[in-house]
């Protein structure tokens, strides 16, 4: 772990040894104390360094077959481009891409419009996360498209490192064939996931809803080891690309930061 901004994310089939129980009392004030980020819309005309940190020079563990590289992050054709490419970097033979917000965000509406990569062993992810590297419990809310089957997206959430809330939702036409809209509305007692404006998961059990403010991430990465989940990795011969047109966070009490926002239609 070479930087305090390192994600320290987990493989789905392994657990992080972490004593979260002693931090549980902090959850009640975590939203107010650490929600530094306010509402925003980013159409990625550029990568704003005050908003985004580009992961560079490390990997998240043995499950990941690539090294995060800032060279794989760019703006092109009106979108943020995250690439996975064959390039010897550190102890890995591939380079991959991730960005994360510099601030944390709490309850509210999170929206992104993007096109995923394709290929077995690849993961195109839009998610929020906080964890031990930030001296907090591991809380997380996920949209993940696995390149082995781009006709569906997996939604999931972690509360103090406990997951097991996975659900697969269809992405009509394929997540890699065009831009699709992914959103979640995160409230204290409810968490709703949407794909292209359609509700695909509604969580109302408070024990299955994260409480800690989190950073927003986009990432494209691969694996040689999690083949049961992500498929057997096979490099396609050319770089794979995830393209993000827009991301937005709308704080509670606000709405319609952009015309297509789900907050214009959902109470």
Residue positions per predicted region:
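Bacterial N-terminal signal peptides that target proteins for export
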Residues: 3-17
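Bacterial N-terminal signal peptides
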Residues: 16-25
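Sec/Tat signal peptide C-region and signal peptidase I cleavage site
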Residues: 26-30
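GH16 jelly-roll
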Residues: 31-267
């Amino acid at each position: 772990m070479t930087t305090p901004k390192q994600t320290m994310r987990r493989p789905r089939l392994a657990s992080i040894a972490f004593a979260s129980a002693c931090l549980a009392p902090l959850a009640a004030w975590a939203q107010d104390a650490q929600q530094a980020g306010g509402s925003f819309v980013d159409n990625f005309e550029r990568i704003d360094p005050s908003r985004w940190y580009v992961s560079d020079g490390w990997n998240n563990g043995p499950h990941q077959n690539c090294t995060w590289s800032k060279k794989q992050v760019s703006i092109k054709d009106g979108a943020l481009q995250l690439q996975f490419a064959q390039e010897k970097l550190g102890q890995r033979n591939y380079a991959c891409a991730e960005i994360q917000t510099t601030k944390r965000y709490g309850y509210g509406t999170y929206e992104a419009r993007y096109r995923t990569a394709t290929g077995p062993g690849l993961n195109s992810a839009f998610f929020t996360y906080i964890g031990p590297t930030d001296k907090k419990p591991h809380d997380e809310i996920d949209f993940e498209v696995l390149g082995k089957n781009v006709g569906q997206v997996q939604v999931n959430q972690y509360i103090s490192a406990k997951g097991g809330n996975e659900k697969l939702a269809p992405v009509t036409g394929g997540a890699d064939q065009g831009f699709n809209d992914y959103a979640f509305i995160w409230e204290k007692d409810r968490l709703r996931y949407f794909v292209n404006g359609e509700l695909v998961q509604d969580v109302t059990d408070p024990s299955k809803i994260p409480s800690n403010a989190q950073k927003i991430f986009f990432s494209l990465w691969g694996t040689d080891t999690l083949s049961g989940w992500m498929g057997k990795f096979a490099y396609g011969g050319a770089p794979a690309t995830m393209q993000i047109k827009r991301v937005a966070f709308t704080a509670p009490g606000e709405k319609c930061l952009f015309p297509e926002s789900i907050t214009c239609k959902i109470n």
